[in-house]
Amino acid sequence: MKPLIALVGRPNVGKSTLFNRILRQKSAIVDPTPGVTRDRHISPGEWQGKQFLLMDTGGYAPENDTLSKAMLEQTMRAIEDADAVIFIVDARSGLTYLDLDIAKILQKTFKDKKIFFVANKVDNPQVALEAQSLVKSGFTEPYLISARDGAGVADMLEDVLNSLPCPEGEEIEEDDSIKLAVLGRPNVGKSSLVNALLGTERHIVSDVPGTTRDAIDSVLKRNGEEYVLIDTAGLRKRTKIDAGIEFYSSLRTARAIERCDVALVLLDARLGLESQDMKIIHMAIERKKGVLILVNKWDLVEKDSKTSKAFTDNLQNQLGNIGYIPVIFTSALTKKNCYRAIDTAAEIALNRRQKISTSNLNRFLQETLTMRHPATKSGKELKIKYMTQIDSDHPVFAFFCNDPELLENNFRRFLEKRLRESFDFAGIPITMRFLRK
């Protein structure tokens, strides 16, 4: 499993800026307003060949400059699950009571954790000089960085990663079993589905949302194939009371997605697709995992012969450009379509791993170009000479052409649709790269 690095600190010390700097992206909203990071961000990263998960714990401005119960809980959960912690303070404003509160938690409760003390916003020599006084936090001399400009970040991150055990050799998933993450909001029936498949009450199941707290692995053997079912706590809507649980569930979901081949995303048939469901789906797609939507509790819906088609059509419309995800209607209670879901997930997993010969791909390309020529742009025509598949853990295709700038989005979508139809990539994200040749 990839090591998890948590960014911890009071609001507005630059956690999101450092998060974006390390991942070289602008995925989090960065704003001077304290607590502007609305959701917990957990993303995969890579530095000098070493892979890891990076977590921005976010936070909001507590009242009276003391740690609120919710913020304390989410910070504690972040540290508890992390392999290393980057504790960030603002070098320009110096240590506050809140910084010292967090420092005490780290030193007393998590003294065995790998903790790296970082002074951010060190963007001139005077601030660097004043930052030396931060040792009164109880830690050794801090790393001096500027997340905004990148100064000092590389050296700090290198030390963090060198302190962590190499994940190679520790992975228990290096086998041929198909790994399925059972995902969804609380109370959609995740544990009930796993119980239905295993024929055992392995999990505690109740009507109280969020009964299952951690990811639990189960092994299912079916038709000579072995499946690892990763059952997780669901994603919650954000409330102050549930902030800690919501964060923890989000983390468990992200780590389960990292491990899986296919994400089984359960919806409540009575509620349909909600924003939290879309969040889970996008997390899986961003990580290039296979996705299968299970509309659970279908037995509780009043229906006729047209209900399932109407539901599917509406769902595909909501999904938009990711409407390639298959949909199966299930009932964990009656076991309706539960094993069909496993069989479909197996097909997705196998197709996600398939390697297509270059000759077959170029035969496909010629047939596709005969059906539709790329549109001209500024009087020039895109000419795709040949294509090939790049070795990866998901389908990646390279198209060699005269000028990638001539590619229109409409033609890209047409090519992707043709690829899906020709090679059965339903439920599988595809990466297409257009290279000059």
From Swiss-Prot:
The keyword Repeat applies. One of its GO terms (biological process) is ribosome biogenesis. InterPro entries: G_ENGA, GTP-bd, GTPase_Der, KH_dom-like, KH_dom-like_a/b, P-loop_NTPase, Small_GTP-bd. GTP 1 binds at residues 9-16, 56-60, 120-123. Residues 354-437 form the KH-like domain. SUPFAM superfamilies: P-loop containing nucleoside triphosphate hydrolases (SSF52540). CDD domains: EngA1, EngA2. GO terms for molecular function: GTP binding. Keywords: GTP-binding, Nucleotide-binding, Repeat, Ribosome biogenesis. Belongs to the TRAFAC class TrmE-Era-EngA-EngB-Septin-like GTPase superfamily. EngA (Der) GTPase family. This is GTPase Der.
